[in-house]
Design a protein with these regions (language model features):
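Positively charged n-region of N-terminal signal peptides that target proteins for export
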Residues: 1-4
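Hydrophobic alpha-helical targeting segments used for export or membrane insertion
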Residues: 6-10
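C-terminal motif of bacterial Sec signal peptides marking the signal peptidase cleavage site
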Residues: 12-15
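Lipid interaction determinants
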Residues: 17-94, 107-147
Length: 147
């Protein structure tokens, strides 16, 4: 009986194991992957359509670095092909409106009706990950994962 109890406890413990993905490593590899894909505006617009789950934030400042996998847990970003979007948290719509892809000479960003802090910065897309790269202007970088 003790043996079965031990096996049961071990199985439950393993099923509750913490996420083993190192999101800081994912972010560090995003730029080279994004650059390799050489997105055009129409291709990127079509590729971005879908539902994304927020995964990670990292930022740097005078006080050191900050990173979290829990600040926006449960937040989802939905980018629809009809150029509408919504950001939901805990099954509640926090933001919604229209989106478009803004293209500068070397990068892309989302142009939104409403300002959403987790969507600021350059878009760096390497499926299934979508990063909003805001650290060049001392903001946080947010990472989403496509479902």
């Amino acid at each position: 009986m003790k043996r079965y109890l031990f096996i049961f406890v071990a199985a439950v413990s393993l099923s509750c194991a913490r996420n083993t993905i190192d999101y800081s490593e994912v972010i560090s590899e995003m730029h080279s992957c994004h650059d390799t894909l050489q997105w055009t505006a129409p291709d990127l617009f079509n590729a971005l359509e879908g539902t994304y789950d927020w995964r990670y934030v990292q930022a740097w400042g005078w006080g050191g670095s900050y990173e979290s996998e829990s600040d926006y847990t449960g937040w989802t970003l939905i980018l629809n092909p009809d150029s509408t979007y919504s950001v939901n948290g805990a099954d509640t719509v926090w933001y919604e409106g229209n989106w478009s892809l803004e293209n500068s000479w070397y990068s892309f960003s989302l142009n939104l009706d409403t300002s959403v802090s987790t969507l600021w910065g350059q878009i760096v897309y390497c499926p299934p990950y979508l990063m909003f790269y805001n650290s060049p202007v001392d903001g946080p970088d947010h990472l989403y994962e496509k479902r």
